[in-house]
């Protein structure tokens, strides 16, 4: 007896060896995919009729700050320095642990409802984000943000907390939580500190999550301080490797791209955040052409302002067509790979495609909508027409988190109301 059978679906496997099924069945047992075919002889406790829908791998959001849902729309359309110094940083200074839990739970709710099944997060009070992930049923790679600012005492305290978090939560939530070390960026951490963090990560067998060359200001500051850019500094201290998740990577030279390729660094492309903050356009087309593993992330809600990865998918596809002057750049299936296969590789999860033996993280997208009719090409529709709100069912680790638009793992109204109250009180404290 299987646990779940999804039948009558268009099965978008994202498996290059298998292809898609126009009318197929997916069987789930003990948290894994056990069968994919036109039909099955199995019976199951739960049968989902997905007629008129697409079943596909869940999406991976490879860079966000979940608790920043509390800052959604708080300070928009400002210069970066003013945005940070006068609004975001003063508000963050007032954060309490319970705020981070409520903001993270709201983020998890939003992701469940829009098709994201795994995410990578870097922030503060990360025990609270981990608790939210545990409660929500999602999969996550979590890191405590380390911002040393050339202050040895602060750096030691941050690293101690980062190490504690990594060891406390690795493999928690039945293996759904992985932990990473999160040095903020090369322009906020000294090279000595970055080296220490890398050594600790190696000792713990943990990955590294870091911002790299998000802005031209970072590029200029690094050249002034070190005579080299962030990528070359990280390369020179032996920081890079397949265990590194580098967010943004906007201001890259061709030489930087070659280093990322050689070291098998995973890149998280955050096009909407980069556009909203006018940070620039990452050379994603070049990176993909060179074989760099490029994934997609939303960044935090303060600079997006939502966690809908379908928006990120469409934006990435369009942005790099216009920026390269090439309408064939980043075709639909390639962008879907960035959000699924590539994301799973970056996060080290056995997900990202529908294949027997893989973990059962998947979503059902309802195609019976006016804006999805008619449908001549499913991948194209998912990229250029679909929205997060078209996701009707979300499954992680073989557990149904949302069924036919109804979230099963939390009280949606309560989560929204508590987050709204926490955000209002937080901003009031910041402005007092």
Swiss-Prot record:
- What does the Swiss-Prot or TrEMBL cofactor note state? Binds 1 zinc ion per subunit.
Listed under catalytic activity are: 5'-deoxyadenosine + H2O + H(+) = 5'-deoxyinosine + NH4(+); S-adenosyl-L-homocysteine + H2O + H(+) = S-inosyl-L-homocysteine + NH4(+); S-methyl-5'-thioadenosine + H2O + H(+) = S-methyl-5'-thioinosine + NH4(+); adenosine + H2O + H(+) = inosine + NH4(+)
Q: Which cofactor does it need?
A: Zn(2+)
Binding residues annotated for substrate, in chain numbering: 92, 184, 214, 299
Q: Return the EC number.
A: 3.5.4.41, 3.5.4.31, 3.5.4.4, 3.5.4.28
Top EC group:
hydrolase
> Domain of life of the organism in this record?
Archaea
Recorded coiled-coil stretches: none
Q: Give UniProt keywords alphabetically.
A: Hydrolase, Metal-binding, Zinc
Specify which residues bind Zn(2+) according to the UniProt entry for this protein. Answer: 63, 65, 211, 299
Q: What InterPro entries does the annotation carry?
A: Amidohydro-rel, Deaminase_MtaD/DadD, Metal-dep_hydrolase_composite, Metal_Hydrolase, MTA/SAH_deaminase
Q: Which family does it belong to?
A: Belongs to the metallo-dependent hydrolases superfamily. MTA/SAH deaminase family.
Q: Write the protein's name.
A: 5'-deoxyadenosine deaminase
């Amino acid at each position: 007896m299987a646990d779940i059978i999804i039948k009558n679906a268009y099965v978008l496997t994202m498996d290059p060896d298998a292809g898609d099924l126009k009318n197929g069945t997916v069987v789930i047992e003990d948290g894994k995919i056990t069968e994919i075919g036109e039909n099955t002889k199995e019976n199951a406790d739960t049968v989902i009729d997905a007629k008129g829908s697409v079943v596909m791998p869940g999406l991976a959001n490879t860079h966000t700050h979940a608790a920043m849902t509390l800052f959604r729309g708080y300070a928009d359309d400002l210069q970066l320095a003013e945005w940070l110094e006068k609004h975001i940083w003063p508000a963050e200074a007032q954060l309490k642990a319970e705020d981070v839990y409520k903001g993270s739970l709201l983020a998890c709710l939003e992701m469940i409802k829009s098709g994201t099944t795994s995410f990578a997060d870097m922030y503060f009070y990360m025990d609270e984000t981990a608790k939210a992930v545990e409660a929500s049923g999602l999969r996550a790679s979590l890191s405590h943000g380390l911002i040393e600012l050339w202050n040895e005492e602060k750096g030691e305290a941050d690293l101690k907390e980062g190490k504690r978090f990594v060891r406390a939560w690795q493999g928690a939530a039945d293996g759904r939580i992985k932990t990473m070390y999160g040095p903020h960026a090369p322009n906020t951490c000294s090279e000595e500190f970055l080296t220490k963090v890398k050594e600790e990560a190696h000792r713990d067998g943990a990955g590294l999550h870091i911002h790299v060359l998000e802005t031209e200001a970072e590029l200029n500051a690094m050249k002034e301080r070190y005579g080299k850019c962030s990528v070359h500094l990280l390369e020179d201290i032996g920081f890079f490797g397949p265990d590194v998740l580098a967010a943004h990577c906007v201001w890259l030279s061709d030489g930087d791209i070659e280093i990322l390729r050689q070291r098998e660094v995973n890149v998280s492309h955050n096009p909407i955040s980069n556009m909203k903050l006018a940070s620039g356009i990452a050379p994603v087309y070049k990176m993909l052409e060179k074989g760099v593993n490029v994934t997609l992330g939303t960044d935090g809600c303060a600079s997006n302002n939502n966690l809908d990865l379908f928006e990120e998918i469409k934006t990435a596809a369009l942005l790099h067509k216009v920026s390269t002057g090439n309408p064939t750049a980043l075709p639909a299936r390639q962008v879907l790979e960035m959000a699924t296969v590539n994301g799973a590789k970056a996060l080290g999860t056995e997900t990202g495609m529908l294949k027997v033996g893989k973990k059962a993280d998947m979503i059902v997208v309802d195609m019976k909508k006016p804006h999805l009719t008619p449908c001549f090409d499913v991948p194209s529709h998912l990229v250029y027409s679909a929205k997060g709100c078209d996701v009707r069912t979300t499954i992680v680790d073989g557990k149904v988190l949302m069924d036919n638009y109804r979230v099963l793992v939390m009280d949606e109204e309560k989560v929204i109301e508590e987050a709204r109250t926490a955000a209002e009180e937080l901003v009031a404290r910041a402005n007092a």
